[in-house]
Design a protein with these regions (language model features):
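A short glycine-rich, Lys/Arg-flanked "PGG" loop and its adjoining helix->strand segment in the class I
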Residues: 118-130
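Short alpha-helix
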Residues: 159-182
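Conserved beta-strand signature within the Rossmann-like core of class I S-adenosyl-L-methionine
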Residues: 131-139
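Conserved SAM/SAH-binding beta-strand->alpha-helix loop
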Residues: 67-69
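Conserved class I S-adenosyl-L-methionine
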Residues: 1-35
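A short SAM/SAH-binding and catalytic strip from SAM-dependent methyltransferases
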Residues: 103-118
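A short acidic, Gly/Pro-enriched loop at the edge of an enzyme's catalytic core
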Residues: 93-104
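Conserved SAM-binding strand-loop segment of SAM-dependent methyltransferases
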Residues: 81-93
Length: 207
């Protein structure tokens, strides 16, 4: 399963075109522009569009993914934008981040395998300082209805890899939600996110 998961993303990111475009996610952009720049971590960052954008705002951006192909694309994008990002390849518990070393964590379409997604969310908590911010956007469980109508919108087809409001409240139980909603949005992100979809979005502060 792990090898299949890695192969899937390496194959997607090895193409010349950026799978989800070179521009940042709209929700992330909107939220980061409200915050004072600091240190930020991007799990499952893929080709780096969001970390690179954060770096252009003055954030010290760290990122990780299991895909070395994703990292290669991300570093090229950073160079194109005249910024640097700290991008590692591996899984969270192997990367050596220091506890409470980040001011923010951005989870943007970070759809981990269903069996481990909650554990990863809870594992990320120790790296975020008290009072730090999580910015989250990912597909909701209702999104399967949108995929059935138009596969171009992308996203996991396994309902257990998708999210509900109750699920994120449970995973982030020691956070105060500054905003939290399930919403239909129009996606226009590169090759694989196009059309109407259903997402969970939130901004939350660690207690």
């Amino acid at each position: 399963m792990k090898d299949q998961w890695l192969d899937r993303w390496d194959n997607r990111y090895s193409a010349e075109a950026f799978a989800y475009g070179e521009l940042p996610n709209n929700y992330l952009k909107e939220q980061l522009e409200k915050l004072e720049a600091g240190t930020i971590l991007f799990p499952a960052e893929g080709e780096g569009r969001n970390a690179v954008f954060a770096a252009t705002l003055g954030w010290q951006a760290s990122a990780y993914d299991i895909s070395s192909e994703g990292r290669n694309k991300a570093l090229k994008l950073a160079e194109k934008n005249n910024v640097t990002i700290n991008y590692q390849v591996g899984e969270l518990d192997t990367l050596g981040y220091s506890p409470q070393s980040f001011d923010a964590v951005a989870l943007i379409y970070a759809h981990f395998p269903a069996a481990i997604k909650s554990a990863i969310h809870k594992g990320l908590d120790k790296y975020l300082r008290n009072g730090g911010i999580v910015i989250f956007e990912a597909f909701s469980k209702k999104h399967l209805e949108y995929i059935a109508r138009d596969e171009n919108v992308g996203g996991p087809k396994d309902i257990d890899s998708l999210f509900s409001i109750d699920e994120v409240k449970s995973d982030f139980a020691n956070y105060d939600f500054l905003e939290l909603e399930e919403k239909e949005i129009d996606l226009n992100e590169g090759i694989y996110h196009n059309g109407k979809g259903s997402v969970i979005r939130f901004v939350a502060r660690k207690r």
